[in-house]
């Protein structure tokens, strides 16, 4: 047993010593990005009221959503999603629920894959991006905030006679953190009744507490329970989540939670 431990330690150490940008094992387990508290503060610096804008739509509208593309060398599934989404005249916008990339410095490849190309697309729909745990490895947050934007924000879908509220929460490190949590609960209590529907977009889902994603884990049980109770008591309509690469549809307290499967090529 001791010999096996020594061999594993040696192999792991050897990988760390010879790693380059394409195989930075250390960065996968020890994120050098800032924590959720700082990410929230920096999001406010970018958008002081965290308002990401307005989408105009009809009373009944369509939006496309996918999770966990994990773009590495290929992005065939994301290409299929993007082509269908950007050639659908009924679509109002798109959402990617985090884990956009899988390796260091690969965010530009993801953004190119999800971009609008007039030679093959008919509609330049807006895409909203959610921060996932893989997106903060290898100092990924610095890249994300400069090329994409804040990790916490909200936007409206406005239609004749009303509007819907979408809120994107940063759960990339498996917690909202006290500052984001206070802002979110205060925002819901003040503004929820002004909207027809309220939809939450986030990466780490609230129902799995089994540390199913190794180094990032899932939400602490106490935080999940408190958050789920709050959402149910404030008439939130829908929560869209990813992270576990497993599709599930859960209803609790008249609130629907949809966990999306991964769109990554390896998940074909």
Regions found by a protein language model. Name each.
Residues 71, 101-102, 135, 206, ...:
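Short active-site segment of divalent metal-dependent hydrolases/proteases
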Residues 63, 94, 166, 198-199:
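Hydrophobic beta-strand anchors of alpha/beta hydrolase catalytic cores
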């Amino acid at each position: 047993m001791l010999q096996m431990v020594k061999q594993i330690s040696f192999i792991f150490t050897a990988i760390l010593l010879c790693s380059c940008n394409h195989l930075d094992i250390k960065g996968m387990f020890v994120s050098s990005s800032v924590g959720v508290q700082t990410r929230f503060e920096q999001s406010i610096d970018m958008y002081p009221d965290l308002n990401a804008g307005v989408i105009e739509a009809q009373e009944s509208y369509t939006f496309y959503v996918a999770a966990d593309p994990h773009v590495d060398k290929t992005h065939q599934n994301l290409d299929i999603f993007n082509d269908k989404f950007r050639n659908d005249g009924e679509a109002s916008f798109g959402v990617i629920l985090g884990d956009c990339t899988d390796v260091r410095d690969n965010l530009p490849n993801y953004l190119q894959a999800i971009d609008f190309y007039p030679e093959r697309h008919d509609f330049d729909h807006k895409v909203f991006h959610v921060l996932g745990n893989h997106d903060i490895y290898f100092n990924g947050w610095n890249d994300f905030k400069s090329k994409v934007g804040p990790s916490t924000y909200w936007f409206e879908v406005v239609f004749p006679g009303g509007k819907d509220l979408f809120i994107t929460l940063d759960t990339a490190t498996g917690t909202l953190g006290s500052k984001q949590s206070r802002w979110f609960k205060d925002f819901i209590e003040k503004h929820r009744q002004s909207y027809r529907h309220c939809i939450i977009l986030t990466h780490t889902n609230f129902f799995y507490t089994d540390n199913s994603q190794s180094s990032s884990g899932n939400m602490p049980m106490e935080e999940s329970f408190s958050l789920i109770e709050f959402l149910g008591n404030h008439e939130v309509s829908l929560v869209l989540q990813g992270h576990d690469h497993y599709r599930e549809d859960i209803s609790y307290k008249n609130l629907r939670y949809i966990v999306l499967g991964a769109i990554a090529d390896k998940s074909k």
